[in-house]
């Protein structure tokens, strides 16, 4: 049976940083969800062929970052190149910040950064569902619009209160 996964859209877009040793990358994702309040758990689905999949598997940590609507072009660029061949921070004008607990960097331009340690992973076909325990949070006081994906590279912003 086939289904059109776009029926599940719109979805909020996030950026996820990962690192193993000195290698780091950023991936744009719309497949993510909160899983638990206590402990605070977040799930992200990452394609098994992605460089970020390798980094998360090896490093066992990631940072989930919430971009603003005005970051749409940067999010598109991040999602269009492999971090295996390019440093996405410098290539796309994003500022890495040292995290408090984990090795992958925060993204300065994002509204929220959630530092996560991999608590579990689930084989999910051509993706892996990484369950991250949130070990530190960073939030901006700005009220910029959140970025959502309608599927097919169509984006829009939603105001937050």
Cite the ranges covered by each PLM segment.
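Basic, polyanion-binding surface patches
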Residues: 1-161
